[in-house]
Structures are given as structure tokens and as C-alpha cells.
Amino acid sequence: MSQTHLSTKKFADFPLKPEILAALNENGFEFCTPIQALSLPILLNAKDIAGQAQTGTGKTMAFLVATFNHLLNVAAPESRKATEPRAIIMAPTRELAIQIAKDAKLLAAHTGLKVGIVYGGESYETQRAVLDKGVDILIGTTGRIIDYVRQGVISLSHIQAVVLDEADRMFDLGFIKDIRFLFRRMPDAKSRLNMLFSATLSMKVQELAYDHMNDPEKVEIEPLEKTSKNIKEEIFYPSMEDKMRLLLSLIEEDWPDKAIVFSNTKHSCEKLWSYLEGDGHRVGLLTGDVPQKKRIRILEQFTSGEIDVLVATDVAARGLHISDVSHVYNYDLPDDCEDYVHRIGRTGRAGQKGISISFACEEYALNLPEIETYINHSIPVSNYDKDALLDDIPPPARIHRKPPTSRTRDGGSKGAHRSGGNTSRPPRHRTRRP
């Protein structure tokens, strides 16, 4: 874990347990982000919170620190059994749950508190075995948590802290009935520490908060701009004929360390994967059809650097929290302007610089005015020289291939199809309009 401090407030300034401060220090956390600096004084005073904060603002560490500190300060109920968690953290997607659990386990190092994670798509019995041994903090997606509650594997009758992360996404994905089902099986809201975080505090999110929380205090970190100043945006107007060649040329020139390519359909993503794989790139594919185990493996490879380019649909990419993404390519402009913000928000996080490149092709160019109205600025336009685009593109690879393996980037692997195995990239010869 790492983060760039965005406030002058330090974690050491708060009355945190020594075990938590030790874990924070060991993992490079000294200064708080604004959402942490504003929410921790409330939470450490055992008051509920409804926080508005975008992804990448440090909200995960805010609620994890508060949860661990609360459990260390408040004794566990004497009648509690091993199969009765003390805290529950609900996330809309498997990937977000996995990331939260990863950070939670780092914080748990000196506390003696056990962290467990459950989500669909993985072995029911394997996850149950962890629950049978007992966990203090349960992290997971609502559907799998409900499965274990209904089967009597766990009970929520002694929950002392609750976190609902990305509540707006919960509504988008239709999980609100599940959430209310789980809340009804917990102790009264006044006997718990309740935390809700959402990118937007819409009326429906606030209604959920007030129905199941104890007079939560609202904390809002509203960005002045919907897109970060750390992200350099640009847009091209390619013909349908040039579109694939332009993408491959840009990637060859930019040579991104870690890039995500977004497209609007599964079919288009599969086509992109085929051409990128055929061109020698280390590429992964995420669509709704990718099995969960393979999905996790691809994300691990992307995070570790074994894969350089990830091709994804919006649905498949929801909940992804991957650091150090240098480039985002919008092969198709999204139909939903909010998806544009979510897409490019994968880069330029935690104070880092990022690059977002979008294509306004004949099929999706009509989406641009609404996007620019929503983000309240025009996206700078770049031109390209058609004659400078790559013209020696190998045939696309077949979609059914073994998972990518680590390969070197020098001659004989990536770029080996070019004359002499030269890995230098041809100039793009692009110019900007005034």
C-alpha cells in the first residue's frame, strides 16, 4: 500500500491503537487524505458516517482504520461464537472485496483480529472452511454473504461495525434488497458503528443510510472537477478503417507500462484482444463471459506486470482498483457519460500522472457532446498522419489461447515482427488544434 499525502493531518495525530499505527507506519501511511482527515474524527468518536468520496481518495483506509480501532476499543460480546463476525464490510464487486481484504490483512498484522473474505465464483466449501474457524471482520459481496447466513454457517447477531462501500454501485447493480436483508439480521443500529461511502449521496443512498444507520453525519469530498487534473486527456477522430491501426500505433509509440483499453461490447473487446495479442503485446481480456478464476488470474498478472494491456468492458471492469495504470484508451466513447469519468479515473490516482486517449469514431462520436457537457470542459483534439500508422500488423490471434506468460520486451519477442527486430516506435506525427 502506498499513497501520496493530500493533507497536513497525520494518522499519528489521532487516538489510534498502537497496533494500528504500527501497521500504518510499516506500510508507508503517515499523512491522511482529505476524506480520512474529515471522517476519522467522527468515526473515532463512535459516530456514524455517510461519506461522499470518489474512488482513489483513500476512503478504504478511512473505514478500515475506524473498523479495526473500534473492535480493539470495544469488547466482543461474551456470548459471541466463532461463527459470528464482529464486523461486516459489503462491496458491490468481487474485485473490490478482494482489494479491501488485501488492505485489511495488512492492518490486521499486530491486532490479533482475523479477516475473512467471501464472494461468488469461488469454492463455497473452501470459503466456508475459513468461516467455520471464525473471523472477526467479514468482507464480501452481498450474494455470497446471504448464502452463508441462510445456511446457518454464520450469524450477524453480534455485529459491532458495518461498512457499505460504493453504495451507489449497489443500487446500479440491483443489490439493495440484499443489503436490507442483511441489515435486518444485525443488532439495532444504535449498537453498531455504521459507515457508508458512495461516489454520490443521492436521495436513494441517503434514504438507505437513514433507514439503517444511527443519525449519520454527512462528509462530502466533492471534486471541483469530475476528471482529475493529473489526467492528460486527448481525443482522435479516426475513420472506422483506421481505428485499429491507430490504436496499435499509439500503443507502439507510447509503450505504456500499464494500460486499460475500454470498448463498449464484448465482441469488440475480443477483437481488440486478438489484434493486440497477434501484435506481440502481453494482453488480458475481461468481459462478462470470463470465468471468475481466470478473471482473478488475469488481474493478478496485470497488477504484477506480467500483463501490460488489459482490454475490458465497463461491466467487467467495475470495482477494479489497480494502482499505477499509466494509460487509458477509450476505443469506443461510452454511451453513459459517467462511464467516461469512471474509465479515465483508473489512471492518475493518488497524485500520479495519467493519460487518457479516446476515439470519436463514426459510430460513437455523437456521445461526445454529452460527455463534454458532463465533465464541463472540451477534450483536446489530436490529429494523426494516416501514412504514419503501422501497416505491417500481423494477423489477429485466435481467442482461445493459453494465458499470457512473462516475456521480455527486447528483440525476438515484443515487436519482433518489425524489420530487424527493432523495438523503436515510429512517430505518430500528430498535431494539436489551437
Curated annotation (Swiss-Prot):
Alphabetical list of PROSITE patterns matching this protein: DEAD_ATP_HELICASE, HELICASE_ATP_BIND_1, HELICASE_CTER, Q_MOTIF
Compartment(s) where it occurs, according to its Swiss-Prot or TrEMBL record: Cytoplasm
Motif stretch (Q motif): 9-37
One MF annotation (Gene Ontology) recorded for this entry: RNA helicase activity
Primary location class: cytoplasm
Position of sequence motif DEAD box: 165-168
Domain Helicase C-terminal: residue ranges: 243-390
Transmembrane segments: none
Annotated EC: 3.6.4.13
Entry-linked InterPro entries: DEAD/DEAH_box_helicase_dom, DEAD_box_RNA_helicase, Helicase_ATP-bd, Helicase_C-like, P-loop_NTPase, RNA-helicase_DEAD-box_CS, RNA_helicase_ATP-dep_RhlB, RNA_helicase_DEAD_Q_motif
Residues bound to ATP: A53, Q54, T55, G56, T57, G58, K59, T60
Enzymatic class: hydrolase
The family this protein is said to belong to: Belongs to the DEAD box helicase family. RhlB subfamily.
Subunit structure, as described in the record: Component of the RNA degradosome, which is a multiprotein complex involved in RNA processing and mRNA degradation.
Function: DEAD-box RNA helicase involved in RNA degradation. Has RNA-dependent ATPase activity and unwinds double-stranded RNA.
The name this protein goes by in its record: ATP-dependent RNA helicase RhlB
Protein source organism: Shewanella frigidimarina (strain NCIMB 400)
